[in-house]
Design a protein with these regions (language model features):
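The serine-hydrolase catalytic nucleophile loop
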Residues: 1-6
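A generic structural signal for short, solvent-exposed coil/turn residues
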Residues: 7-9, 188
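Active-site machinery of serine-nucleophile hydrolases
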Residues: 9-20
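Flexible "cap/lid" subdomain of the alpha/beta-hydrolase fold that forms the substrate-access gate
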Residues: 16, 23-61, 65-201
Length: 201
């Protein structure tokens, strides 16, 4: 999805574009531990990867799920994240409070994947290309479709990761809410320069 932006940035920046835990080529741990896909855990993954690649401090940008991870990294690792960009996502607490009435239909997948294990995995797993393809279609925003080989690779990666993708979204309705509520009540703030870009749904 971000291949062109990454290539442009790489002309004069070091660019690291990892698949988040549970997505693409990254590990997909399974189990009942609610912290497996907590954004706190995933943020620690990103920081550990950057450090392993020799970057003790870095600017961080994330889109959608990646923005939730980036936001958490900024809160948990303010000594590491020097600048932060969050694109196209509401903070976790707001994500559950802002959508109302029929306008919430755009986020139907959030509510589906918030359910306990079983039903979401079965429903999405029964037609993963239709489910994930729906989002590719509505997120495209352009009349020319995504190249067929890119679409096929994206769908194949999602098809093989249904349980971990659902676990990531489920964490956003459980443990991530707890973490963010504690931080909000404690008055935690992002101390680095922050850019937020949100499209109009």
């Amino acid at each position: 999805m971000w291949r062109h932006v990454a290539a442009d940035l790489a002309a004069d920046h070091t660019v690291i574009c990892p698949d988040l835990r549970g997505y693409g080529a990254s590990d997909k741990p399974a189990g009942p531990d609610v912290d497996l896909y907590a954004k706190r855990t995933m943020a620690a993954d990103v920081v550990a990867l950057a450090r392993a690649l020799g970057h003790e401090r870095f600017a961080l940008a994330g889109h959608d799920r990646g923005a939730l991870v980036a936001f958490r990294a900024g809160l948990d690792h303010p000594d590491v994240v020097t600048q932060l960009a969050c694109l196209d996502v509401l903070p976790t607490l707001d994500m559950w409070q802002v959508p109302r009435g029929t306008s919430a239909a755009v986020g139907f997948h959030l509510y589906l994947m918030a359910h306990p294990p079983g039903l979401p995995e079965k429903m999405i797993g029964a037609a993963p290309d239709t489910f994930f393809g729906h989002f590719l279609d509505i997120w495209g925003g352009r009349p020319d479709p995504m190249p067929a080989e890119i679409r096929a690779a994206y769908l194949a990666a999602c098809r093989g990761a249904v349980p971990s993708i659902v676990a990531d979204y489920r964490a956003s309705a459980t443990v991530d809410v707890e973490h963010d509520q504690v931080d909000r009540e404690a008055g935690a703030r992002l101390g680095m320069p922050v850019t937020v870009i949100q499209q109009d749904w």
